[in-house]
Amino acid sequence: MMRFTIAGLLAVLAAGQPASTSQALPGLDATVTKVERAPTASLRDCPPGTNTVTAVSRPGEQFAVVTIAFKASAAFKPSPMLRPSVLDTAGKKFNTASTIVDPAGVPEFSCTFPFRVPDGTKLTTLQIATTSIDLSSFEAK
């Protein structure tokens, strides 16, 4: 599982290891739990709400579905957030139709973010605002 928090970011920086340059989601702990491939994907917002639209891939494409578990601390202040995006091994950016919305006091929630990608695309990075999470360990499976 990949996690990012302010304390974790500071520990990595202090150890001299590469990490994201800033913490874009103060008070919100996010853990990538899996990356899957699918021919269809739900376009629900995060946390899941009433949007029940399902997308279907076109020939030569698939959905890379990234699941993220979120945990909001008392320091979390809801604000408009950008949509997550992913990068592949060539540095090409893929966006999702799903957005992160105000969790309305829900302290823990899990969301899936579908990304329409060409068949065989290997993802390297998940980006939420200016925070980056390495996905290469999920793609090695």
Positions of the model-derived regions?
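Compositionally biased, low-complexity segments enriched in small residues
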Residues: 1-2, 117
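Conserved functional micro-motifs across diverse proteins
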Residues: 13-141
